[in-house]
Amino acid sequence: MRPLKLILQAFGPFAGREEIDFTKLGDAPLFLINGATGAGKSSILDAICYALYGETTGSERTGDQMRCDYAAPESLTEVIFEFELAGARYQITRQPDQEIPKKRGEGMTKKSHSATLVALKSDGNELIANKPNPVAKAVVELMGLDVKQFRQVMVLPQGKFRELLTANSKEREQIFGQLFQTQLYSQIERALFERAAGIRKEKEEFDQQIKGTLSVVGLESEEQLQTELTELAPVLTHAQSQLKAEQQQWDETKAHYQAALELEQQFIRKQQLVVEIATHQEQATHIEMLRQQRQQAQKAARLTAVHQQWHQAQKNLQQAKLKVEQQQTLLQQAKAQQQQAQQASQQASLACEEVPKLNEQRITWQRAEQKLLAQENVQQAVAKAERELQLATQNALNLQQASEKLEQELQNQRLEWEQQQRQLTRLEVQKARMNQLVQQVQAREREQSLLNELQTAQQALLRFEQQHHHIQTQAEQAKLTADKLEFAWHTQRAAELALALTQNEPCPVCGSLEHPNKAQYSGDVVTKVQVEQARQQQQDWVQRQQEAFHAWQQQGFKTEQIAQNLTTLSSELTLQQVALLNELIEQQQILHSDIAALQQLNPDLLKRQIEEGEQRLAHTKMTLEKQNQNQQQAWQTLAQLQAELASLRQEIPPELSDLDTLRSAIGRVQNQIEILQKAEHTAREQWVQAQKQFASVQAAYQAAIEAHRESQRQQEETTSAWQQGLLHSGFSDESAYLAARLTDEAIVNIERQIAQYEERSAMLSGEQQALSRKLAEKNRPELEPLLVKVTQAEEKMALALQAFTQHQSRMDGLQRVAKQLADLYQKNRALEAEYQVVGTLSDIANGKTGAKVSLHRFVLGVLLDDVLLQASQRLMKMSRGRYLLKRKEERAKGNVGSGLDLMVEDSYSGKWRDVATLSGGESFMAALSLALGLSDVVQAYSGGIRLDTLFIDEGFGSLDPESLDLAIQTLIDLQQGGRTIGIISHVTELKEQIGLRLDVLATRMGSTLRLIT
């Protein structure tokens, strides 16, 4: 990553908009970021880190805490960082959470954190991400480093340079893994571990399956399974033999019972046949009646055709007679219609004799109509010409007025353009005045803020003072209480000793043999614990008193500092004769309105408008001249049309001068002609049609008479045939015939009943004779004893079957379990063999054996050796041959992973020791060497991550002059190799030796930047 441009606005100590163009420093520059303490040198690194990751280099402050207190309310806190990575250019813009003025009304509103990442291309920018989280992920993917790793390898923040040096193996593994892209080895470790864990899990599942399989049959071990299988085999064989014997006995008993049951059913059937035959013979009379009914129906069936013909002939004769009567009526109607149509046709022909006279009148009126139409066209042309003349006159007048108006507008615009030119000379003066007012307002607001802080601090100081006095009183009270308890305890102890004194024996305290005035105690009993608790409470109150006094004292210092700052600022403002805040704001508003009004001025636009107006004026004058010509032409056209109209009016008679009346008369005549002609044509057609209708009806009448004669003849013939049929069939009349006649279905039904009766008679008789012959020499059996034997045999067989089924089911379950166990043991042996290989590889790859070094750390250890080789060369140079960096090879204690920890060799003592034992300056040189070595090796391996840039924040102040020169020379060598190196320091020697410099200048209204090349 190579920085190209950094823009800061209202960020950190920078109140305004500051821009750093790194390209002006040249390719791979070595430059110094210089400035006083607190000016904002580290804020530049914070801005780069915050733009990329949304976090500052030290992580002590969040984005919303980076807003400059001196920034104008409407100025957004924003960082824009443009950088180059792998030949591609990117720009990232980030704005933290912040309060901004409302667009409408007063007050502030919260603006949420926003971020945008764009790829800068020659053919247009490409948006990569436009929200904080997606931007952070995209930056990690592009850089190959997260924020913590970025701070450790590309930025050595102030006070953080030891972290890269003293990081443990786990932290260094994460950094190197990202830099060298060795995730493949971690994936191998994880894959082996997961595969081994999966095999272990499968093996445990198989063990559980074995236990579960045995538990299904209620056993706990395979020995029990084999024992039961051996013991159950003969028992199952005996049960099977017993079942076969009982089943054979049941079959024989059941066969005997079945034969006796069939014989009993035959005897019962013989008795039933006697009853059924008697019942069947009762239907003989009904069957005979059906036979006679069938015979009569068969006779009637032979007369059916003759009877139908006779009835049809009578029906046809009646229809023919009715037809003759209908046709006779129609013939009379047709003759009357023919006569009426003939009279109507003659009358229509007489009326049509008026048509020629009407046609002549119509033609005369149509000629007059043509002249009136011509006159109307000329009148319309005259009206149009008058309108065109009026329009031309009005247009000429409008153009004349527009021309005069344009000339006046142009004159006004020229005057306004000259006035704007004069006013614009005041804009820069007003802007400068506005900047001065903004600074003065900010200063007055700072003064007001300090005044508020002072009031708040004074109130807090009063609270701290009151709190201190209260706690001091409590501490004094606790001391009095503890003193009283301790005195009472000593008095109590003296009284206890006095009780033990004996006359003429020495006192253990004073040695006297006489004890005239023994100590006495009459108060409450006091224990040593109570005294100690009271003293502890006293100490607690004393501690709280000290803390309260310290807080009071600190608040006093803070209040004094605020008062001093307020006094200094107020004095400066008074010295500069700065107006009061409300006056400044009023002036600012007036000036803002004036500047806004001046910024609205646009003399260039007005100049273009003047030029366009001049072009419009010339065009308007040209159009006016053409319009005058059109007006003259319109006068001539109107005069010609008026003369033509007067001539046409003289040719038309007065009585035909109205066009609508004339057209109405023509229409009436034309309509009358059409009505007469149509009436004649219609009457003639109706007469012809009536003649045709009369002839047709007359022919139909003759045909109806002939059909009636034929129907009468057929009726006579069928009547004779019907009378002969009745005579030969034996029926007395038509009623007797109809009574005997049956439908085909009825006859079929009678024949079916007769056939069924005869078939059943034969069947019952045959079955009775067969049973009589079969049972002639047999006795009727007794079924009850046989049924008892069958039931007993069936019960014995069921018991034998139940016993066999139980034994067989148990045997099947045991054999199934035995087979499942065999399959499980075979699979388990395969898993054990696989785990011997995979498990061993997993333990080795994950660092669970030997030196506790995983495969990933082993690979990184080799890479770290290369890094340390490069780093040691620089460290040897900077430490004047004293120190070398080396990887710690001893195994860490316990289960902690190792393999990437660092040690340093001290050539003065000849011993190796931990890098944490280095001094501040030595640690800085070692960390710098390690960072530079890491940069060399990463770029040499070309793993997709390029460490083209290194920022170092402080640390040079801990070096002596000679070490400082060596460190600078090392950085110069690195810079000549194509690296961009930025150093943040206030060390004077660096300022003298490094020509490229970015100065951070601190002012009362915020810091500014100045690039010196």
UniProtKB/Swiss-Prot annotation:
Gene Ontology cellular component terms for the protein in this record: DNA repair complex
InterPro entries assigned: P-loop_NTPase (IPR027417), Rad50/SbcC_AAA (IPR038729)
Protein origin, superkingdom: Bacteria
Positions of ATP binding: 35-42
Function summary: SbcCD cleaves DNA hairpin structures. These structures can inhibit DNA replication and are intermediates in certain DNA recombination reactions. The complex acts as a 3'->5' double strand exonuclease that can open hairpins. It also has a 5' single-strand endonuclease activity.
GO molecular function: ATP binding; ATP hydrolysis activity; DNA exonuclease activity; endonuclease activity
Protein name, entry field: Nuclease SbcCD subunit C
Disulfide bond among keywords: no
Chain segments annotated as coiled-coil in the UniProt record: 242-262, 281-486, 604-717, 739-838
Bridged cysteine pairs (disulfide): none
Gene this chain is encoded by: sbcC
Quaternary structure (record): Heterodimer of SbcC and SbcD.
Keyword Secreted part of the UniProt annotation: no
Residue spans crossing the bilayer: none
Entry-linked PANTHER family: ABC TRANSPORTER ABCH.3
Keywords: ATP-binding, Coiled coil, DNA recombination, DNA replication, Endonuclease, Exonuclease, Hydrolase, Nuclease, Nucleotide-binding
Pfam families membership: AAA_23 (PF13476), SbcC_Walker_B (PF13558)
GO BP of this protein: DNA recombination; DNA repair; DNA replication; double-strand break repair
Organism for this UniProt entry: Vibrio cholerae serotype O1 (strain ATCC 39315 / El Tor Inaba N16961)
Membership in a protein family: Belongs to the SMC family. SbcC subfamily.
Gene3D superfamilies on file: P-loop containing nucleotide triphosphate hydrolases (3.40.50.300)
